[in-house]
Amino acid sequence: MSKKWFTYENGTVKEYGSVDKFPENCVGFVYKITNIQTGKFYIGKKSLYSNIRKKLTKKELAEYSGPGRKPTKKLVTSESNWMDYWGSNKGILQEIKDSSTDSFRKEILKFCFNKKQLTYWEVHYQCINEVLLTDKSYNDNVLAKFFRKDLVESE
């Protein structure tokens, strides 16, 4: 179900199939997934790495020497599932399941170098594309704070 990510700049297309091709110190990106047939789109963010707290093994606990209480867990950083990621919106995921990934284009809008940038640029692109005001967007909310249903004007 994997399909590569692309950037479109100044008429050139660049393909991203591995973390090595991303800019140095990049922690994630803001993306746009577009249904080519309908023009409907989804804007979101994705981190390139995830942190997992793993329990220390007996050997690691035995090797620990230091003041205070022994730690029980360690922080392990690993590459996220960014390559196979298709967003968190149930609507777009169902459409991908029903049709195929060939009907969709995965585009990187902005590379980000810390988590605050990642959140800011996601909200920026969602707002300038008016994701809650157009029927051409799969997005139902912005920041889990502003919802499409709350913006519908009642008569």
Regions found by a protein language model. Give the residues of each.
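Structure-specific nucleic-acid interaction/processing domains
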Residues: S2-E155
